[in-house]
């Protein structure tokens, strides 16, 4: 545990899903005011404090036999093994990589089109560790706290392959831009390979589906239908409302939306 990490996690859990906890903090949490701290803890998020700034991190763990739509996560190691045993040349081939190097990544931002003025407020990713699929999310509680937000993210990124849904054009360039602005404060940006499942989905299903948005592909192809989901286009409005009122209730729904996104990237890759 790095020196600047403060950690307090609630006891919440679900039958087939475990909210992961971290060790006790090294620095007193009382040094930083965290609005609605109890609600964050109950949701399974803990603060990470760095020089009087902080971000919030949530981690959830799923067993490999967990079924997400039509598929279970234990199929991922099988697929990676097949790629490694195959000589087939394909843009999505995982040949040369291990399953625990796959990094299924998505963000939520303050704007849907990218460009100037758009900032990431949630970094979410799923990965294989200790025979579980883990989802880790880093949340930016306010503009100006980007250093702990990106620092903790980059400190935990040890994966060589980035898997996204249109992330090559949108999500990762946003990270690169922010890193450029803060690079003297942040770890070196890792080198990633990049598997973008959006382009493969367009080639496969653009003539069969009305749209190839991830939520549509989930429902029509992967057999996963979201319940009580918050549409992604509402994320900027919800985040700005959170900045104003600090109540995280609606943010929790955005984080669940993001969690489903990264889990669906796994089953889509399968």
Task: Mark where each language-model region is.
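N-terminal accessory regions of nucleic-acid-interacting proteins
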Residues: 1-98
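Short hydrophobic "helix-edge" motifs at membrane interfaces and signal-peptide entry regions
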Residues: 96-97, 186, 250-251
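Short, conserved acidic/polar surface loops in the N-terminal third of protein domains
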Residues: 68-69, 113-118, 175
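Acidic active-site catalytic centers that drive phospho-/nucleotidyl reactions
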Residues: 106-108, 171, 196, 261
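Conserved DEDDh/DEDDy metal-dependent 3′-5′ exonuclease domain
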Residues: 130-221
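Active-site-proximal flexible loops/turns
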Residues: 113-115, 173, 203, 268
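Acidic, Mg2+-coordinating catalytic module of metal-dependent nucleases/exonucleases
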Residues: 209, 214-270
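Conserved RNase H-like, two-metal-ion catalytic cores of nucleic-acid enzymes
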Residues: 89-161
